[in-house]
Design a protein with these regions (language model features):
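Basic polycationic patches enriched in arginine
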Residues: 6, 12-13
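A structural signal for short, hydrophobic/glycine-enriched beta-strand patches
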Residues: 31-191
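C-terminal capping/extension of enzyme domains
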Residues: 183-215
Length: 215
């Protein structure tokens, strides 16, 4: 994993005459074989949603395109009364060049979530900080006394859930819900270098943390 992604791909090309991809006619020359794809997919991606009846707060982890891929599901879960409040976490810039928390809040307000049910975490720059800062808000404000849910992308959910589980008090039951973006799904992530980079980063972190299989 120390070798850069581009160098690794170039090295694979030199000794693999025809990369074998199980899910597609062409791997676009990226050099991942069937066994590698299946192994990495199994480690990184969940196979099913974490079923839950209700959570007092849903933490939505910010990202560049959170309003496109995450917030529609967050609002739906809120309107279905699966969650009572939305905690929007992230201080990086979103696609509209606003902080993630601000961009996500605007989406929630525009789609019928009242301001009184929106909590903001304004500073997190990575998943560790998402978990740490959001957990501090949850405990200090006492917005959840029984259960918390988190929402992020499929390739991100395993490590995010692990970090939140370790950051939250043990008395809080933790649930998770994942969404898919266009290019980093369990059925297409190996087709572009950017998606491979995201998945391989998650793969490395999951292995390093010792995250157990998704259940």
């Amino acid at each position: 994993m120390a070798v850069s992604l581009r160098s690794s791909i170039a090295k694979r090309r030199s000794h693999l005459n025809a990369p074998l991809c199980v899910f597609t006619q062409s791997c676009k020359g990226l050099g991942l074989n069937k066994r590698e794809i299946e192994s990495i997919t199994q480690v990184v991606f969940p196979t099913h949603q974490d079923e839950f009846q209700h959570a007092e707060v849903l933490v939505v982890l910010g990202s560049y395109k959170a309003t496109q891929y995450k917030m529609p599901t967050a609002v739906r879960l809120y309107k279905e009364k699966k969650v009572s409040k939305l905690l929007l976490s992230g201080g990086n810039l979103a696609i509209d060049q606003k902080p993630e928390f601000e961009s996500m809040k605007e989406y929630a307000l525009d789609n019928g979530v009242p301001d009184s049910d929106i909590i903001l975490e304004r500073h997190a720059k990575n998943t560790v900080e998402n978990a740490q800062y959001s957990s501090e808000i949850i405990v200090e404000s006492e917005i959840a006394k029984r259960s918390v849910a988190i929402l992020t992308t499929a390739f991100h959910i395993k490590r995010a859930k692990y970090l939140f589980k370790n950051a939250l008090p043990q008395y809080l039951e933790l649930h998770s819900y994942f969404v898919n973006d266009r290019s980093t799904r369990r059925d297409n992530w190996w087709l572009t270098e950017s998606a491979i980079s995201r998945v391989m980063h998650s793969h490395e972190v999951i292995k390093r943390l010792g995250v157990k299989p998704y259940a």
